[in-house]
Structures are given as C-alpha cells and as structure tokens.
C-alpha cells in the first residue's frame, strides 16, 4: 500500500468520524481478489469503520481504468453516475486522488466539488504530457464550475498554482497528517527483522520508482563505506504490487556492485511499519527526488523513531527540519545524503532524544489530520457539521 493509500484511508476515517451517521457515500474501485495490492485485513478494517458510520458503499469494477487518462476519465464519469442518486440538494462530491480529477466535469450543478490530488504527473512523470494535460483539464473544469482543490502541503499548493495554473483562491490547505488509527499501525503487529538487522539497521521504504531516490541512498551508503564509516545493515523496502519491476532489478544490481550489506524487500506488508518502533533502528531515511508530501517522517515521529534523514524534496522540507526534527540534504545528491546519514549515525543519545521530541511536537501541532479535515469541511460543507451538531444535542 502506497503513502497515498494510507492518506486516503485516513481521509475516509476523518470523514466517518465528523459526518452525521448515514451521510457518507463512498464509491471505491474494487481490486480483483488475486490482485497483489489487495490487503484483506485492511479491507476488513475499512469496511468495519464505514459500517459503523452508516456509510453507503457503492463499489466500481474499474481497476483496469486506473492507468491511463482515457480510463480515468471513464472512471470519473462512472463514479459520478453511481453516486448521482445521493447528490441532490446539499451535497459535496470529493474526487479523492488523481484518478478522480475529472469528476467535476460530470457532477450535477447542485453538488459542490472538492478535488484532493495527492500527486501529479508533472511532479513524478514530467515526460507524460497526455496525463498532465488530462489532469490540468480536470482541475480547470472543476474550478471554473465553482469547485475547490485541496493542497496536501505548501509545496503542493505552489505546484498547483504554478505548474497547473490554478488561482490561489480556489486552493484550500489540507496538510497531510496522521489519525490515531495511523499511529496504531506504527505500534501494531511487527514482522521479524531480516537476518543481519538485529544488531542495528537503517530503514528506508516506499514504492519502487526512481523518484523515491533509493539509488541515491545506495550510492550514499557506498560512499560512507569507502570512507571507512560503519553503516548498519540497510533494510530497503522498495515495493511494487506485481512482479519484480526493472527498478527493483536495478537496485538489486547496485547493492551487489557496491558491496552493501542490505536486505531488499520488493513486496510491501503494512507490518513493516512496526520496525519504526524497534530499538535496533539507527536511522530512517527518505531519499526522495520528488515528494508531494511524504508521510514516513510523520510515522517515524509517531513511533519515536530516528533520527530521520530526508531530502528537501517537496513536502519533506516542511517536516524534516535540519538539526531540529532530523537531518536533511538536497535531492539527487548522494554525496550530501551521505553527510546527512553520517550525522544521524553519529548523533548522541541526547541529540536523538531532542530530535524525537521535536518531531513528536511538530506532528501534534501541525499534522493532526482530524483537525485538518474538519477545517476543510467547515469551508466546504458546514451544513454537514451543523447537522452533526444537531444530532449530538
């Protein structure tokens, strides 16, 4: 499950908690039973949460449509058609993430529209001109019709208003964050550590794509080794949902060529987040070249893990503040990343405690996701919150 998946679940959880019983309607894309990205326990947990909220769940069979602009356009139309019986009178239609950026083109005039993109092609696949054009059209049509767009970070706001040309006034701040359930995942069931990691390890995890910067991390570890710096065992979770992809093959070859002591895991299991609470953990590294937000530092702060080492790519610059909540380096610079990682490994117990305390404080003060979602609802659907207040009284 990607960071976007965790964030979308947190968004649903916040809505389920804030909205009156029975008001929430969810139109999810159903993955086939054998799909490698499907997590049965995750599914059970979400279904239970939605049932408790009295939510109506209207599933779509559209997994094959998620990979192209034409498919996403059709998926957006199907989703609105499925939800349309519930969109009369006061209603808010939320297009949650990129595949649903075109819902504003099909929404009935009576419905307000909010789009919540968690990334864009311009950020992670700048060569994909057709996808970028489709995203721009969906965003533009929505705001032209009076809809709004949520920005998950300051960087994403600048990106939406700059690269995609949205007026500043139509972009709402919805800073990404954690719900209590997300923090429970960090402290939940744990997989056994890989062999070699029990005496100390460095952890990095994310999707197996070049923009995550894992090759830069491997080169940084190699540079430290060349300098005689003892780097603990690297546990690299570079995950995909299918067969091993070309980037994973490249990473495996790089580990072998550089002679790095590392474990490469190519399939994601939510239980790996439990490693953030392991006392053998020496550092958490987020080496991204591009990052709309980046949840892993927050998860590390929630677990008291670290030090956190991250690049300043995108939203990471908001959470990993050099010398305050962690150590930072410019993106796509193995040399600078090696310096930051060396600082983390050399940090004294007092420094580690200070960084962890500052990270926990930043999480509590700026990234309480329940507070962020409620703030957006107060702007987009105050009538729903008023109804909830009326029910409570």
Where are these predicted regions, by residue range?
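Nucleotide-activated donor-binding/catalytic signature segment of Leloir-type glycosyltransferases, i.e.
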Residues: 248-270, 275
């Amino acid at each position: 499950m990607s960071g976007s998946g965790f964030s979308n679940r947190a968004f649903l959880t916040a809505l389920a908690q804030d909205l009156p019983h029975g008001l929430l309607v969810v139109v999810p894309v159903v993955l086939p039973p054998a799909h490698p990205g499907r997590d049965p326990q995750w599914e059970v947990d979400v279904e239970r949460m939605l049932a408790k909220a009295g939510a109506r769940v209207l599933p779509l069979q559209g997994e094959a449509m998620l990979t192209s602009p034409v498919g996403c356009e059709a998926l957006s139309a199907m989703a609105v058609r499925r939800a349309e019986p519930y969109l009369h009178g006061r209603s808010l239609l939320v297009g949650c993430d990129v595949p649903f950026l075109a819902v504003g083109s099909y929404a009935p005039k009576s419905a307000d529209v909010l789009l919540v993109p968690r990334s864009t092609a311009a950020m992670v696949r700048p060569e994909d001109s057709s996808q970028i054009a489709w995203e721009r059209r969906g965003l533009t049509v929505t705001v032209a019709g009076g809809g709004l767009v949520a920005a998950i970070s300051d960087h994403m706001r600048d990106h939406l208003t700059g690269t995609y040309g949205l007026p500043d006034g139509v972009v709402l701040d919805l800073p990404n964050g954690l719900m209590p359930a997300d923090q429970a995942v960090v402290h939940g069931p744990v997989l056994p550590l890989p062999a070699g990691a029990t005496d100390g390890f460095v952890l990095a995890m994310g999707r197996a794509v070049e923009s995550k910067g894992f090759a830069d991390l491997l080169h940084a570890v190699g540079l430290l080794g060349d300098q005689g710096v003892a780097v603990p065992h690297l546990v690299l979770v570079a995950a995909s949902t299918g067969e091993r992809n070309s980037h994973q093959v490249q990473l495996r070859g790089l580990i072998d060529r550089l002679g790095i002591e590392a474990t490469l895991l190519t399939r994601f299991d939510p239980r790996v987040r439990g490693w953030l609470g392991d006392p053998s953990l020496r550092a958490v590294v987020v080496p991204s070249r591009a990052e709309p937000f980046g949840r892993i530092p927050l998860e590390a702060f929630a677990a008291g893990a670290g030090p956190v080492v991250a690049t300043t790519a995108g939203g990471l610059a908001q959470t990993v503040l050099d010398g305050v909540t962690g150590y930072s380096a410019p993106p796509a610079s193995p040399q600078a990343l090696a310096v930051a990682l060396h600082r983390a490994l050399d940090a004294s117990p007092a420094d580690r405690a200070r960084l962890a305390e500052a990270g926990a404080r930043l999480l509590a003060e700026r990234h309480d996701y329940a507070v962020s979602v409620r703030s957006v609802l107060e702007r987009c659907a105050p009538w729903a919150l008023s109804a909830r207040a009326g029910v409570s009284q």
